[in-house]
Curated annotation (Swiss-Prot):
This is Probable DNA-directed RNA polymerase subunit delta. RNAP is composed of a core of 2 alpha, a beta and a beta' subunits. The core is associated with a delta subunit and one of several sigma factors. Pfam families: HARE-HTH (PF05066). One of its GO terms (molecular function) is DNA-directed RNA polymerase activity. Keywords: DNA-directed RNA polymerase, Nucleotidyltransferase, Transcription, Transferase. The lineage of its organism: Bacteria, Bacillati, Bacillota, Bacilli, Bacillales. Belongs to the RpoE family. InterPro entries: Asxl_HARE-HTH, RNAP_delta_N_dom_sf, RpoE. Residues 116-182 have a biased composition (Acidic residues). One of its GO terms (biological process) is regulation of DNA-templated transcription. It comes from Staphylococcus saprophyticus subsp. saprophyticus (strain ATCC 15305 / DSM 20229 / NCIMB 8711 / NCTC 7292 / S-41). One of its GO terms (cellular component) is DNA-directed RNA polymerase complex. Participates in both the initiation and recycling phases of transcription. In the presence of the delta subunit, RNAP displays an increased specificity of transcription, a decreased affinity for nucleic acids, and an increased efficiency of RNA synthesis because of enhanced recycling. The gene is rpoE.
Amino acid sequence: MRIQDYTKEMVDEKSFIDMAYTLLNEKNDTMNLYDIIDEFKALGHYEDDEIENRIVQFYTDLNTDGRFLNVGENIWGLRDWYSVADIEEKIAPTIQKFDILDDDDEEDKNLKLLGEDEADDDDDIPAVTDDQETLNDPEDPEDDDVDEDLNETDIVIDEDDEDLDEEDEEEEEFEDEEETEE
């Protein structure tokens, strides 16, 4: 059965990874991940939020299923289409080559190493920003209001209160042990 003939119910029941395999087999060409997802959205009449969870699983399956091959830039194809030599060429890591500094380069004072120019730009950043200066200002009446609200709602438990509760429990346990010994 062709993927275009799938009903909404069939799309709901079938996994996206199997549908992707069928789709790529029918098209016999590589496809962008987003184009594949758009095909599924059209077939199942999905909205973005309805399909979101399935897309996460689908992307995971694409990466782990041995039938598929990422040929770069989020373009996916079927591994069956490529010879072993092609696969090695397509997925081989690219190596960036850098010029090696020789003794003359090291003596050149105008030569900047990677990251040096970024460090110089940080000199004009103030150590304290305006936001931090007013943080926890004892004279700010708004802080008092917040503290009062927190105390009224008992959302925040002071550490001292917790320690007292633990001490009370320990004393009660100790008293219970003494009573059982007598």
